[in-house]
Regions:
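H-loop/switch region of ABC-family ATPase nucleotide-binding domains
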Residues: 95-96
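ABC-family P-loop ATPase nucleotide-binding domains
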Residues: 1-47
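ABC ATPase nucleotide-binding domains
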Residues: 122-159
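Helix N-cap at the start of a conserved alpha-helix in ABC-type nucleotide-binding domains
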Residues: 71-73
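Walker B catalytic motif
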Residues: 64-65
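A short, surface-exposed alpha-helical micro-motif characterized by mixed small hydrophobic
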Residues: 101-103
Length: 159
């Protein structure tokens, strides 16, 4: 059950925040007494994030935090995340949902094929007049004509 996991974390993480755990469980309407195997994929992801944010770590790694959740839950999560972090807490968020996170991240580190291809503070991007998406496209050498060329090849209209 969720409460059994909470008890395990409380025992092994001295800085575990029961208050944060309970508040987030209530916010996401997750049952404390149901077996985790009965949770939907979205609920399991929410629960994993709740546990990560409640353990009291200075650095919290969250990988594709809300895969399987609708846009409303994801937006709510981002707002809650921005509001609950203490000054000593840093979240490292891995995501492909760039537009959703661009408004509240302070730094973007781009990793491609195991190597860092970009590392920039979002303030620098804003000052340059670019968006995070345009910065990423530039760093990844994205070809803007990629789709039209593929469609020409598929439909045979380029011949």
């Amino acid at each position: 059950t969720a409460s059994a996991h909470r008890d395990f974390y409380k025992e092994h993480f001295p800085r575990f925040s029961d208050r944060r755990y309970r508040s987030l469980m209530e916010f996401f309407s997750l049952p404390d007494n149901k077996p985790l195997r009965s949770f939907s994929l979205g609920q399991k992801n929410q629960f994993e994030v709740i546990m990560a944010l409640s353990q009291g770590a200075d650095y919290i790694l969250i990988d594709e935090a809300f895969a399987g959740n609708d846009i409303f839950n994801r937006e709510d999560f981002y707002k809650v995340l921005s509001g609950i972090l203490e000054d000593n807490e840093t979240v490292i968020l891995s995501t492909h949902l760039i537009e959703e996170v661009s408004s509240f991240i302070s730094r973007a580190v781009l990793i491609r094929e195991g190597s860092i291809t970009g590392d920039i503070k979002t303030e620098e991007i804003e000052n340059s007049g670019k968006t995070l998406t345009s910065y990423i496209k530039e760093k990844y050498n994205y070809r803007g004509d990629r789709v039209s060329k593929a469609l020409d090849d598929i439909t045979g209209e380029a011949e």
